[in-house]
Amino acid sequence: MTVATGEPADEAAALPGHPQDTYDPEADHECCERVVTNISGLRFETQLKTLAQFPETLLGDPKKRMRFFDPLRNEIFFVRNRPSFDAILYYYQSGGRLRRPVNVPLDIFSEEIRFYELGEEAMEMFREDEGYIKEEERPLPENEFQRQVWLLFEYPESSGPARIIAIVSVMVILISIVSFCLETLPIFRDENEDMHGGGVTFHTYSNSTIGYQQSTSFTDPFFIVETLCIIWFSFEFLVRFFACPSKAGFFTNIMNIIDIVAIIPYFITLGTELAEKPEDAQQGQQAMSLAILRVIRLVRVFRIFKLSRHSKGLQILGQTLKASMRELGLLIFFLFIGVILFSSAVYFAEADERESQFPSIPDAFWWAVVSMTTVGYGDMVPTTIGGKIVGSLCAIAGVLTIALPVPVIVSNFNYFYHRETEGEEQAQYLQVTSCPKIPSSPDLKKSRSASTISKSDYMEIQEGVNNSNEDFREENLKTANCTLANTNYVNITKMLTDV
């Protein structure tokens, strides 16, 4: 049972221990004040406190959104994409959750995020939600001279001299590869035999004739070509190393590792030839040295990967394979299981056949691999009915196994391909000529050739353009002496004059 006292409400509120609730009508009015936003004729209504959660954005900053205010209709007017604003408004209402509508393309929604100035964090959140792979930062050296040298050797499209250096590097790589292939022709290759003459014993290794008292390999044309190529590769590698922004990160780059692998075999081979002594030239040691030299010289073929530094296509392929390692691992795992199953099955299916081509399960591995990959050399074939059934199932299983991860790999390739082409389109020369009062920005002087620019750099350039336009618009509100060709801007001064 509740008992009501006879004390007035005001007196009870004034007693000690009773909190006094103060009511501020103006604060409550500001809290509940609503604002209307018109997006190309579609009107949205929300509270100001909702927009004020993100004061750095276009709608959250009163000064920024006032540029688009229409005093006649008492609303904010934008000529923007209407379906995108549902997600933009929900970003304010939910406190920072951003999700692209399914009927809005990626590029359009990205432009809307930049226009409403939701910030870098919102853009990164959106990109992660869409499955974009975060781009690695590519810092530049702080020293001006090192920066110029680094751009000259690392970014072929940064300037004309950089292109010339890239062309020279590609030509040297091609000459080295052609020389590596031509020296194996029979007309250039010497047989491994001992030649005795003039008291000097010679031993030939691969294409080089090595003399213990007087070497003739240094006059070999292929050796001279190889030496010239190595001189260029070494010079290029050392210049890159001394100009790089991070010495520790330099050796973690796969391209620099390829450069090292392309150079080291020459010096190992040269050192082995020079260190050879006549008393060590026994047959066993000669065969061992020959095998080692052949393996080392085989590593030279990896020099072809140096072309990927100057080829966007090879870079895209490498990035695709790197991003698809999980799918490729699953593919190899599935193939491994299939090889074990079908090689075992075909062995037991052909076990009773006297002329069976599958003497053991390991011998059947090769047949299972070429069958599952739909190559089918025909060097090993089943002859019994059971073996042919197993072979048919093996081929069908191979097709299905290989086809499953292919769409994911193709999707990754399309992503990296479009990212590279988009980066080239975004790195165009930006120049604003609509009004002489627009301040020039040094960030706008980016040539189209700078296709290596990252998306973060492009967003900074875009932000610089927006800031320049904002400064001009604020001046335009005061002077009204210049017209800016922008459909998203409402000239309040002109509107009031017309009224």
UniProtKB/Swiss-Prot annotation:
S4-S5 linker as annotated region, ranges: 312-325
Q: Which topology term describes how it sits in the membrane?
A: Multi-pass membrane protein
Chain location of the short sequence motif PDZ-binding per the record: 497-499
**Lipid-attached positions, S-palmitoyl cysteine:** 244
Q: How is its activity regulated?
A: Inhibited by 4-aminopyridine (4-AP). Inhibited by dendrotoxin (DTX) and charybdotoxin (CTX), but not by tetraethylammonium (TEA). Inhibited by tityustoxin-K alpha (TsTX-Kalpha), a toxin that is highly specific for KCNA2. Inhibited by maurotoxin. Inhibited by kappaM conotoxins kappaM-RIIIJ and kappaM-RIIIK.
Q: What is its main location?
A: membrane
Give the residue interval(s) assigned to the motif Selectivity filter: 374-379
The chain's Cytoplasmic topological domains, given as residue ranges, are 1-160, 244-254, 311-325, 418-499
Kindly state the tissue distribution recorded for this protein.
Answer: Expressed in a wide variety of gastrointestinal smooth muscles. Not expressed in portal vein, renal artery, and uterus.
Provide the alphabetized UniProt keywords.
Answer: Cell junction, Cell membrane, Cell projection, Endoplasmic reticulum, Glycoprotein, Ion channel, Ion transport, Lipoprotein, Membrane, Palmitate, Phosphoprotein, Potassium, Potassium channel, Potassium transport, Synapse, Synaptosome, Transmembrane, Transmembrane helix, Transport, Voltage-gated channel
Phosphoserine carried by residues:
434, 440-441, 449, 468
Q: Which InterPro entries match?
A: BTB/POZ_dom, Ion_trans_dom, K_chnl_volt-dep_Kv, K_chnl_volt-dep_Kv1, K_chnl_volt-dep_Kv1.2, SKP1/BTB/POZ_sf, T1-type_BTB, VG_K_chnl
Q: Which reaction does it catalyse?
A: K(+)(in) = K(+)(out)
* Transmembrane spans: 161-182, 222-243, 255-275, 290-310, 326-347, 389-417
Q: How is it modified after translation?
A: Phosphorylated on tyrosine residues; phosphorylation increases in response to ischemia. Phosphorylated on tyrosine residues by activated PTK2B/PYK2. Phosphorylation on tyrosine residues suppresses ion channel activity. Phosphorylated on tyrosine residues in response to CHRM1 activation; this abolishes interaction with CTTN. This is probably due to endocytosis of the phosphorylated channel subunits. Phosphorylated on serine residues in response to increased cAMP levels; phosphorylation is apparently not catalyzed by PKA. N-glycosylated, with complex, sialylated N-glycans.
Concerning Pfam families, the annotation shows:
BTB_2 (PF02214), Ion_trans (PF00520)
Q: Where is this site: Important for binding with the scorpion mesomartoxin?
A: 381
Q: What segment(s) does the record annotate as region Disordered?
A: 1-27
Q: How does it assemble?
A: Homotetramer and heterotetramer with other channel-forming alpha subunits, such as KCNA1, KCNA4, KCNA5, KCNA6 and KCNA7. Channel activity is regulated by interaction with the beta subunits, including KCNAB1 and KCNAB2. Identified in a complex with KCNA1 and KCNAB2. Identified in a complex with KCNA5 and KCNAB1. Interacts with the beta subunit KCNAB1. Identified in a complex with KCNA4 and FYN. Interacts with PTK2B. Interacts (via C-terminus) with CTTN.
Q: What this chain does, per the record? A: Voltage-gated potassium channel that mediates transmembrane potassium transport in excitable membranes, primarily in the brain and the central nervous system, but also in the cardiovascular system. Prevents aberrant action potential firing and regulates neuronal output. Forms tetrameric potassium-selective channels through which potassium ions pass in accordance with their electrochemical gradient. The channel alternates between opened and closed conformations in response to the voltage difference across the membrane.
Entry's PANTHER family?
Answer: POTASSIUM VOLTAGE-GATED CHANNEL SUBFAMILY A MEMBER 2, VOLTAGE-GATED POTASSIUM CHANNEL
The entry's family comment says: Belongs to the potassium channel family. A (Shaker) (TC 1.A.1.2) subfamily. Kv1.2/KCNA2 sub-subfamily.
Q: Could you share any additional remarks the record makes about this protein? A: The delay or D-type current observed in hippocampus pyramidal neurons is probably mediated by potassium channels containing KCNA2 plus KCNA1 or other family members. It is activated at about -50 mV, i.e. below the action potential threshold, and is characterized by slow inactivation, extremely slow recovery from inactivation, sensitivity to dendrotoxin (DTX) and to 4-aminopyridine (4-AP).
The name this protein carries in UniProt is Potassium voltage-gated channel subfamily A member 2
